[in-house]
Amino acid sequence: GWMVTAPSMSPEHGPSGEDTKKASTIVAGCTMDNQIIFDVLSNALHASRILKMSASYQDSLRSMLNRLAPMQIGKYNQLQEWLEDLDNPNDKHRHISHVYGLFPSNQISPYTHPLLFQAAKNTLLQRGDEATGWSIGWKVNLWARLLDGNHAFRIINNMLKLLPGDEVKEAYPQGRTYPNLFDAHPPFQIDGNFGYTAGV
């Protein structure tokens, strides 16, 4: 069987698919956990080669890597957020943790994993562009990683619209930036600013 984290949860988000009846947010082996563990083990293996660590230690890392649950494509051609196919294509939640493998990690590439690449793109299309600042900043980077500079630029343009007043009065306001160029969110989200600059 696969090695997975348990208990696990996809940050601030639980399955709300058609068949889940708002199931528990606690699951086993959500996709983001598996992606982060893949990076940790891969980096440890790389370091162990450089440091000429024992063959048995390197073999144990390889064995764990080979037993991790793989990323999976669901019935809506999306990258699954959970081991089970529980995603809802109408879910517009701002958290998109399961595309960590696309960015900031580099596990999903159009050259090595074209089907996962398309599934990650489908996930972003299903979730939409509206979100709070930190999530918008991340989406700029995700669309850039998806080789769609026009989509990333559209998000940047929306992000840099000035807020009509001096405070945020709704979840997703028309303006996303204060006059001082801080990302608009009560009080503000510096992650949005940092995400934007990383995407550029």
Regions found by a protein language model. Give the residues of each.
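Active-site core of glycosidic bond-cleaving carbohydrate-active enzymes
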Residues: 30-199
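Acidic/histidine-rich catalytic neighborhood
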Residues: 1-47
